[in-house]
Amino acid sequence: MNLKDYIATIENYPKEGVTFRDISPLMADGNAYSYAVREIVQYATDKKIDMIVGPEARGFIVGCPVAFELGIGFAPVRKPGKLPREVISADYEKEYGVDTLTMHADAIKPGQRVLIVDDLLATGGTVKATIEMIERLGGVVAGCAFLIELDELKGREVIGDYDYKVLMHY
């Protein structure tokens, strides 16, 4: 299945000069959505994953069904002020400054093998901050999976030696 057939391209959104890749049509098509989830589940199967971690918001959309299919838990990564219990945080650079991500301080147990799942790998800032928090909690990042990679933004360089899977390249 060619998943790119289910990605809408919106020029100059959210600002002039940006090409936005919208996964909404993929999610709206049960066959395409299921296919994408199964591809990530297949990638994860041999990695002995204990926990899926997904950054808000579209990491939830992709990561939760993967966790469900694998029969394991899901831990959310959120912006500050969105999680009710004790959190840890990591900063990451954005185009115009610094932003922060958080996760519950007890989300990952030492030694747990974690797969990070998100919709998009762009500059790599989100995944870098997520990796930092998982490792601070003693987790092992066994891999990363993305629906889309924007190749020209070089997020792959931020991932470095971590194993990863991408379903579509732009």
UniProtKB/Swiss-Prot annotation:
The chemistry this enzyme catalyses reads:
AMP + diphosphate = 5-phospho-alpha-D-ribose 1-diphosphate + adenine
Q: Where in the cell is it found?
A: Cytoplasm
Q: What is its EC number?
A: 2.4.2.7
Any GO CC annotation of this UniProt entry: cytoplasm
Specify the pathway: Purine metabolism; AMP biosynthesis via salvage pathway; AMP from adenine: step 1/1
Which InterPro entries does the protein's record reference?
Ade_phspho_trans, PRibTrfase_dom, PRTase-like, UPRTase/APRTase
Gene Ontology biological process terms in this record: adenine salvage; AMP salvage; purine ribonucleoside salvage
Signal peptide range in chain numbering: none
Q: What does this protein do?
A: Catalyzes a salvage reaction resulting in the formation of AMP, that is energically less costly than de novo synthesis.
Q: What family does the entry list?
A: Belongs to the purine/pyrimidine phosphoribosyltransferase family.
Q: Subunit composition?
A: Homodimer.
Q: What is this protein called?
A: Adenine phosphoribosyltransferase
Name of the gene this protein is made from: apt
